[in-house]
Design a protein with these regions (language model features):
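Metalloprotease/metallohydrolase-associated module, dominated by Zn2+-dependent proteases
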Residues: 2, 67-103, 115-177
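Metzincin-family zinc-dependent endopeptidase catalytic domain
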Residues: 1-108, 112
Length: 177
Protein backbone atom coordinates (compact mmCIF):
# COMPACT_ATOMS: atom_id res chain seq x y z
CA UNK A 1 0.00 0.00 0.00
CA UNK A 2 2.63 2.52 1.06
CA UNK A 3 5.02 1.61 -1.77
CA UNK A 4 2.29 1.73 -4.42
CA UNK A 5 1.08 5.12 -3.21
CA UNK A 6 4.65 6.45 -3.09
CA UNK A 7 5.34 5.22 -6.63
CA UNK A 8 2.13 6.74 -8.01
CA UNK A 9 2.65 10.09 -6.28
CA UNK A 10 6.33 10.25 -7.27
CA UNK A 11 5.20 10.21 -10.90
CA UNK A 12 3.12 13.31 -10.11
CA UNK A 13 6.05 15.09 -8.45
CA UNK A 14 5.19 14.37 -4.81
CA UNK A 15 6.94 12.55 -2.00
CA UNK A 16 4.78 10.66 0.52
CA UNK A 17 5.53 10.16 4.17
CA UNK A 18 3.40 8.12 6.59
CA UNK A 19 2.82 9.38 10.11
CA UNK A 20 0.78 8.35 13.13
CA UNK A 21 -2.00 10.97 13.40
CA UNK A 22 -1.57 11.03 17.18
CA UNK A 23 2.09 12.07 16.94
CA UNK A 24 2.48 14.27 13.89
CA UNK A 25 3.95 17.75 14.05
CA UNK A 26 3.59 20.56 11.57
CA UNK A 27 4.51 19.48 8.05
CA UNK A 28 5.98 21.27 5.08
CA UNK A 29 3.43 20.24 2.49
CA UNK A 30 -0.01 18.69 2.49
CA UNK A 31 -1.45 16.66 5.36
CA UNK A 32 -4.02 14.05 4.36
CA UNK A 33 -5.94 11.85 6.78
CA UNK A 34 -7.08 8.44 5.57
CA UNK A 35 -9.53 5.98 7.05
CA UNK A 36 -9.60 2.32 6.01
CA UNK A 37 -13.08 0.96 6.72
CA UNK A 38 -13.84 -2.72 7.07
CA UNK A 39 -11.79 -5.87 6.69
CA UNK A 40 -8.81 -5.21 4.42
CA UNK A 41 -7.96 -8.87 3.89
CA UNK A 42 -9.02 -10.99 0.92
CA UNK A 43 -10.30 -14.40 2.05
CA UNK A 44 -9.15 -17.76 0.73
CA UNK A 45 -11.82 -19.54 -1.33
CA UNK A 46 -12.60 -21.97 1.50
CA UNK A 47 -13.36 -19.02 3.79
CA UNK A 48 -15.74 -17.30 1.39
CA UNK A 49 -19.18 -16.37 2.55
CA UNK A 50 -21.87 -15.17 0.21
CA UNK A 51 -19.96 -12.19 -1.14
CA UNK A 52 -21.76 -10.49 -3.99
CA UNK A 53 -19.71 -8.52 -6.54
CA UNK A 54 -20.19 -4.78 -6.18
CA UNK A 55 -21.09 -2.49 -9.03
CA UNK A 56 -21.48 1.24 -8.76
CA UNK A 57 -20.18 1.28 -5.18
CA UNK A 58 -17.56 3.84 -4.22
CA UNK A 59 -14.40 2.06 -3.10
CA UNK A 60 -12.83 5.38 -2.18
CA UNK A 61 -14.18 8.83 -1.33
CA UNK A 62 -12.74 12.22 -0.52
CA UNK A 63 -14.59 14.67 1.73
CA UNK A 64 -15.92 17.91 0.28
CA UNK A 65 -17.34 21.09 1.79
CA UNK A 66 -18.43 24.30 0.13
CA UNK A 67 -17.01 23.23 -3.22
CA UNK A 68 -13.59 22.47 -1.76
CA UNK A 69 -12.11 18.98 -1.77
CA UNK A 70 -10.79 18.31 1.71
CA UNK A 71 -7.79 16.18 2.79
CA UNK A 72 -9.90 13.39 4.26
CA UNK A 73 -9.96 10.11 2.35
CA UNK A 74 -11.96 6.98 3.06
CA UNK A 75 -11.32 3.56 1.50
CA UNK A 76 -14.14 1.01 1.76
CA UNK A 77 -12.12 -2.18 2.22
CA UNK A 78 -15.27 -4.33 2.18
CA UNK A 79 -16.24 -3.08 -1.29
CA UNK A 80 -12.65 -3.34 -2.51
CA UNK A 81 -12.31 -6.83 -1.09
CA UNK A 82 -15.49 -7.96 -2.83
CA UNK A 83 -14.15 -6.54 -6.10
CA UNK A 84 -10.82 -8.37 -5.79
CA UNK A 85 -11.94 -11.67 -4.25
CA UNK A 86 -12.96 -13.42 -7.50
CA UNK A 87 -9.56 -12.60 -9.01
CA UNK A 88 -7.25 -13.71 -6.19
CA UNK A 89 -9.18 -16.00 -3.88
CA UNK A 90 -7.18 -19.11 -4.85
CA UNK A 91 -3.82 -17.38 -4.46
CA UNK A 92 -1.59 -17.80 -1.40
CA UNK A 93 -2.19 -15.38 1.46
CA UNK A 94 0.91 -13.32 0.64
CA UNK A 95 -0.31 -12.82 -2.94
CA UNK A 96 -3.78 -11.82 -1.76
CA UNK A 97 -2.28 -9.38 0.76
CA UNK A 98 -0.03 -7.91 -1.93
CA UNK A 99 -2.96 -7.46 -4.33
CA UNK A 100 -5.06 -5.78 -1.64
CA UNK A 101 -2.22 -3.52 -0.50
CA UNK A 102 -1.41 -2.44 -4.06
CA UNK A 103 -5.11 -1.84 -4.76
CA UNK A 104 -5.54 0.27 -1.62
CA UNK A 105 -2.49 2.31 -2.66
CA UNK A 106 -4.03 2.88 -6.09
CA UNK A 107 -7.39 3.93 -4.63
CA UNK A 108 -5.58 6.34 -2.27
CA UNK A 109 -3.64 7.79 -5.21
CA UNK A 110 -6.91 8.27 -7.11
CA UNK A 111 -8.45 10.12 -4.17
CA UNK A 112 -5.30 12.23 -3.70
CA UNK A 113 -5.68 13.22 -7.36
CA UNK A 114 -9.03 14.81 -6.44
CA UNK A 115 -7.58 16.63 -3.44
CA UNK A 116 -4.42 17.86 -5.16
CA UNK A 117 -6.20 18.93 -8.35
CA UNK A 118 -9.20 20.27 -6.41
CA UNK A 119 -11.34 18.73 -9.12
CA UNK A 120 -14.13 16.18 -9.13
CA UNK A 121 -13.55 15.60 -12.86
CA UNK A 122 -12.13 12.36 -14.20
CA UNK A 123 -10.05 11.74 -17.31
CA UNK A 124 -11.20 8.93 -19.61
CA UNK A 125 -8.28 6.66 -18.81
CA UNK A 126 -5.66 5.83 -16.22
CA UNK A 127 -5.70 5.88 -12.45
CA UNK A 128 -7.88 9.00 -12.25
CA UNK A 129 -10.70 7.60 -14.42
CA UNK A 130 -14.12 7.44 -12.80
CA UNK A 131 -14.59 3.66 -12.49
CA UNK A 132 -12.23 0.79 -11.78
CA UNK A 133 -12.74 -2.89 -12.39
CA UNK A 134 -10.99 -5.55 -10.36
CA UNK A 135 -8.93 -6.22 -13.49
CA UNK A 136 -7.84 -2.56 -13.60
CA UNK A 137 -6.57 -2.79 -10.05
CA UNK A 138 -4.75 -6.06 -10.78
CA UNK A 139 -2.89 -4.72 -13.84
CA UNK A 140 0.88 -4.75 -13.62
CA UNK A 141 0.86 -1.06 -14.57
CA UNK A 142 -2.10 1.14 -13.75
CA UNK A 143 -0.95 4.75 -13.63
CA UNK A 144 -2.15 8.32 -13.99
CA UNK A 145 -2.51 9.50 -17.55
CA UNK A 146 -0.81 12.71 -18.61
CA UNK A 147 -3.91 14.90 -18.16
CA UNK A 148 -4.23 13.80 -14.51
CA UNK A 149 -0.53 14.40 -13.86
CA UNK A 150 -0.86 17.89 -15.33
CA UNK A 151 -3.90 18.70 -13.20
CA UNK A 152 -2.17 17.71 -9.97
CA UNK A 153 1.13 19.45 -10.54
CA UNK A 154 3.34 19.30 -13.59
CA UNK A 155 6.53 19.66 -11.54
CA UNK A 156 9.29 17.11 -12.07
CA UNK A 157 10.44 15.02 -9.13
CA UNK A 158 13.31 16.77 -7.38
CA UNK A 159 14.80 16.52 -3.92
CA UNK A 160 12.61 19.42 -2.77
CA UNK A 161 9.37 17.93 -4.12
CA UNK A 162 6.27 18.82 -2.11
CA UNK A 163 5.59 16.30 0.61
CA UNK A 164 2.26 14.57 1.16
CA UNK A 165 2.01 13.21 4.71
CA UNK A 166 -0.55 10.45 5.12
CA UNK A 167 -1.93 9.79 8.58
CA UNK A 168 -4.03 6.70 9.07
CA UNK A 169 -6.07 5.51 11.99
CA UNK A 170 -7.11 2.39 10.07
CA UNK A 171 -5.59 -0.88 11.07
CA UNK A 172 -4.58 -3.61 8.73
CA UNK A 173 -3.81 -6.81 10.53
CA UNK A 174 -1.90 -8.28 7.62
CA UNK A 175 0.79 -5.57 7.67
CA UNK A 176 0.30 -4.44 4.06
CA UNK A 177 2.92 -2.10 2.68
Amino acid sequence: MEKELADQMRAAGFVTDWEDPQRYDAVDGYMVIIDLDGDCRVPFHADLGSEVPVQGVHIGTTATAGGDILPFINVDCEALRTLLTPLVTDEPETSRDYAMGRSIGRVLAHELYHFLSQSEDHPDSGLAKSRFSGSDLMKYKFEFDQSALTRMQPAPVVESAPEVVVASEGSIETGLK
